[in-house]
Amino acid sequence: MLRHVLFVAVAMFTSVASAQSTARTQYTDPYGYFTTDAQYEAWYSLRARLATGFDDVCGDTFCEGDFSNIASLRFECSVQRGSGRIGSCVWSFAASSEEIVPTTGRIEVLQPTWQCPIPVAPHTTIDALLAALAGEDPLHAPLPGTTLSVYDGLTHCL
């Protein structure tokens, strides 16, 4: 009986400690963190300018190889609910390459995807990221707390 009570007490303590730890480090997408229209607008603008910047450089860089049609899917960051600190950011891409089989007329398609981690410095907040990348060329702007850019993250991925 005593052993059962002790087990239940330890299990309850572990559950409470785990719940508290999870509550402290709960992450969401930026939409779950933002509280002002200005934050939403800055995020939408950043994502659009990153996609445009990628399209502008793709033909001379990433899209010269086997896949000339690499397309930006989504730039996303995880944000700690309480502090606004970024957990990580990733930019997803997809492409295709089609080849016709001459003897059958069948089309073979390769459809690679990439999930490119962005080199965000520890303890960077989403608001600091938005401010640092607010200019005309967020693809090449230095990320907060580092000399690296979003573009640098892509060169190690695509």
Labelled PLM ranges:
Residues 81, 93-97, 118-122:
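A mature extracytoplasmic/lumenal domain signature
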Residues 4-13:
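Sec-dependent N-terminal signal peptides
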Residues 14-18:
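N-terminal signal peptide c-region/cleavage motif recognized by signal peptidases
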Residues 86-89, 109-111:
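Short, surface-exposed coil-to-beta transition loops
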Residues 121-158:
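C-terminal partner/receptor-binding element of secreted or periplasmic proteins
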Residues 101-124:
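A short, surface-exposed beta-strand/turn
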